Design a protein with these regions (language model features):
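Cytochrome P450 catalytic-core helices
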Residues: 278-313, 437-458
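C-terminal helix/juxtamembrane-tail motif
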Residues: 523-549
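Conserved cytochrome P450 K-helix/beta-meander segment immediately N-terminal to the heme-binding cysteine loop
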Residues: 395, 401-433
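N-terminal membrane-proximal hinge/A-helix region immediately C-terminal to the signal-anchor transmembrane segment
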Residues: 1-80, 92
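Cytochrome P450 heme-thiolate monooxygenase catalytic core
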Residues: 100-282, 298-314
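Charged, glycine/proline-rich intrinsically disordered loops and linkers
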Residues: 112-134, 227-245, 317-340, 471-502
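Cytochrome P450 heme-binding "Cys pocket" and the immediately downstream C-terminal segment
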Residues: 436-516
Length: 549
C-alpha cells in the first residue's frame, strides 16, 4: 500500500500497471466521482471480468478448508455455483429481507434486556460481558461482540435455516474469529505461527466446516419424520430440510453434480462469511462514529445532530413506539415496525443514513478483490487535465479492484480530509459503484439493522476503569465470596457505583479503536465498552397489537 501511495503522489496518470510473477496488474490511482468515472466504466464491463482460478482455489483451500480432492469436482461445475448463488440468494433478496425485518421487529426491543442473570439474557448479551450500570435502565457491554451476535441472529436463519443457527451456538463467534485472522488463514500460514489469535481462528474454521458438513448430511439424507399415530394430518418433526432456503436450493445443485459434503460446506461457509464479514463491521463502525459525532461539541461541526437526523429520516418507514402496558408494574418494552417496502426504498429517501454507511465503507474498506479480463476493454479518463485520454486494458491482464478503491478512498484530491469520518460526506456526492451482485442485499441488511438500533436505543461511551477500579471490584467480589447477590442488591450496588463515578467526575469519552484488516471491511483491534439505554419519549402506539415472542 505504501508503494502504491507513493506512485499516486508522484504520477499524473490515473491508471498504472505493475508486473507480479509475470502477470500484468492494472491499478486505478486517481478518479472522479462522476457517473463517467473510471470505476463506473469498469463496472459497465462486468461481463468481461472474472475471478481467475488460482486465487479462487487458494482462498477456498486455505480460508475455507476445501480438500484438494474436491478441486476437480468443484471446477467441473464451472460457473453454475456463482450463477445459482445470484439467482437463489441475491435475486431473491426481497423475501429474505422480509423474513429478516420480521426477526428484527421481534429482537430489536431485546437488544439489551437489562437482566443481570446470564440465564435470562439473550444470546447476544451473553457474549458481550453485560453489566448493569444504572439499575435496570442502563447496561454496559462490549459493542462489537453484541453487534456481531445480534446481526448473525437476524441475517443467517433465512439463508441457512433456523434449526441450524439455533443448534450451533458458536456460529457467530466462530465467524468473527475466522474473520479476525482471515488473511493469515487465507495465506495458508501454519496455525502455530507467532500471530496472536491464529490458533483460535484455525480452531473456529475446523468447527465451522464440521458443522456445515453435518448440516449438508442432514439436508441430503433427512431423518425420517415422526408422524403421530392419532393424527395423520400432522407432519411431525420439522427440520431445515423441510424449509426452502437458498442453501437447500444450492444443495440440490450440489447433489446433481455429486459434490462431496465437505466441499459443499466450504462453498457455503465462503458465502455466509462474505455477507457477515461486511455487514457486521459496517454496522459497528457506523454506530460508533454516528454516536460519537452526535456527542457534545462534535455535533456542532456537522450543524445537525447525526442521530437526530437519522431518527427523523427513517421514522416514516420504521417507526418506534411505546405499546400500552398490561399492568402499571410491568411496562411493555418499546416496539418497532418496518414498512413492507423498506428493502425497496431508494437511497434518496434516507440520504443521511446511506451517507453514514458509505462513509464507513470508504474509511474501512480493505477488499483485495482482483479480476482478470476476458477481452480487451477501452477506458477513457473523465479528467481532461491529464495527458493520456484513453487506455486499452489487455485481455488476460488483471484489475486490482479492491486496491484501486482503497487508494481512491484515501485520496485527499477526491475526498478532503480523507482520514476524518464525515457523516454527511455522501449526501451530495455519489459513492463509487460496486461490481458485486451481493452489494444491494448487504446494503439492505446494514440499513435495516442500523435503522432499528437508532430508533430504539441510545449508546454512550463507558467511563474507562483504572487499575484501582478493577482492584476494588476484585476485592469486593472476594469479600462477597460465594454469596450470590439478588437482582435488587446488584441494582442498588450499580446505582452506588454510578453516583460515585459522577461525584469523582468520571465521564466516558469516545475512543475510536485502531482498525485491523478483515476479509473486506476492517475490524476493531479491541472492543469498545459502551453504555446502552432505551430511547426515551417514544410516541404511544400499538394499541390492539400483541407482541409475539
Amino acid at each position: 500500500m505504501n508503494c502504491t501511495n507513493c506512485c499516486s503522489d508522484s504520477t499524473f496518470e490515473s491508471i498504472v500497471a505493475y508486473n507480479a510473477s509475470g502477470v500484468k496488474h492494472n491499478v486505478v490511482l486517481n478518479d472522479t466521482l462522476s457517473e463517467h468515472s473510471i470505476m463506473a466504466q469498469i463496472t459497465k464491463h462486468a461481463d468481461q471480468l472474472y475471478l481467475p482460478r488460482p486465487p479462487r482455489w487458494a482462498l477456498l483451500h486455505n480460508a475455507f478448508s476445501m480438500s484438494g480432492n474436491a478441486e476437480k469436482p468443484y471446477f467441473d461445475i464451472g460457473v453454475a455455483i456463482p450463477k445459482a448463488v445470484v439467482a437463489d440468494l441475491y435475486d431473491e433478496m426481497l423475501p429474505l429481507m422480509s423474513s429478516t425485518l420480521h426477526t428484527l421487529s421481534e429482537s430489536l426491543p431485546d437488544f439489551v434486556t437489562f437482566n443481570s442473570s446470564i440465564v435470562d439474557q439473550m444470546q447476544w448479551e451473553r457474549v458481550a460481558d453485560v453489566e448493569l450500570s444504572d439499575g435496570t435502565s442502563e447496561a454496559e457491554c462490549n459493542l462489537f461482540a453484541l453487534v456481531n451476535e445480534f446481526c448473525c441472529n437476524a441475517i443467517l436463519p433465512p439463508i441457512i435455516g433456523a434449526q441450524f443457527t439455533e443448534s450451533y451456538q458458536l456460529l457467530a463467534t466462530d465467524l468473527a474469529a475466522l474473520n479476525s485472522r482471515y488473511w493469515a488463514v487465507a495465506l495458508g500460514l501454519p496455525r502455530l505461527s507467532p500471530i496472536p489469535g491464529l490458533p483460535g481462528a484455525a480452531l473456529s474454521q475446523k468447527r465451522l466446516i464440521h458443522n456445515f458438513t453435518r448440516m449438508f448430511g442432514e439436508l441430503t439424507n433427512p431423518a425420517v419424520r415422526r408422524v403421530p399415530d392419532d393424527d395423520e394430518s400432522v407432519s411431525g418433526d420439522e427440520t431445515d430440510a423441510d424449509v426452502v432456503t437458498p442453501v437447500t436450493k444450492l444443495n440440490k445443485l450440489f447433489t446433481e453434480h455429486d459434490l462431496p459434503l465437505a466441499a459443499r460446506a466450504s462453498v457455503t461457509l465462503q458465502l455466509v462469511h462474505d455477507i457477515v464479514a461486511e455487514v457486521v463491521p459496517l454496522v459497528f463502525w457506523t454506530l460508533l462514529h454516528v454516536y460519537a459525532s452526535s456527542d457534545g461539541s462534535a455535533a456542532k461541526a456537522f450543524e445537525v445532530i447525526p442521530t437526530g437526523k437519522i431518527i427523523a429520516e427513517t421514522k416514516p418507514w420504521a417507526p418506534a413506539f411505546q405499546p400500552p402496558s398490561i399492568h402499571p408494574s410491568f411496562p411493555s418494552p418499546p416496539a418497532i415496525t418496518f414498512d413492507p417496502t423498506f428493502s425497496e426504498l431508494p437511497a434518496d429517501l434516507m440520504p443521511y443514513l446511506h451517507s453514514c454507511i458509505n462513509e464507513s465503507r470508504r474509511l474501512y474498506s480493505c477488499s483485495a478483490l482482483t479480476y482478470q479480463l476476458m477481452a480487451p476493454i477501452t477506458i477513457y479518463d473523465p479528467n481532461s487535465t491529464v495527458k493520456q485520454d484513453t487506455w486499452i486494458l489487455d485481455a488476460d491482464s488483471y484489475i486490482d479492484i479492491g486496491l484501486s478503491q482503497s487508494l481512491i478512498n484515501s485520496s485527499p484530491a477526491i475526498f478532503p480530509e480523507p482520514k476524518v469520518y464525515r457523516p454527511d460526506r455522501f449526501t451530495t456526492i455519489p459513492y463509487p459503484p460496486s461490481t458485486s451482485p451481493s452489494h444491494p442485499y448487504k446494503s439492505a441488511l446494514t440499513l435495516a439493522i442500523l435503522t432499528g438500533i437508532f430508533q430504539l436505543w441510545e449508546v454512550a461511551p463507558a467511563p474507562k476503569k483504572s487499575f484501582f477500579d478493577h482492584m476494588n471490584e476484585a476485592r469486593e467480589e472476594a469479600q462477597i465470596g460465594a454469596a450470590a447477590l439478588s437482582n435488587e442488591q446488584k441494582a442498588a450496588k450499580n446505582v452506588q457505583l454510578k453516583e460515585k463515578r459522577e461525584k469523582e467526575g468520571k465521564v466516558g469519552k469516545w475512543v475510536i479503536p485502531k482498525a485491523i484488516d478483515g476479509a473486506s471491511v476492517k475490524l476493531p483491534k479491541a472492543d469498545v465498552r459502551v453504555r446502552i439505554r432505551r430511547r426515551e419519549g417514544l410516541p404511544a402506539g400499538g394499541f390492539g397489537m400483541r407482541r409475539v415472542g
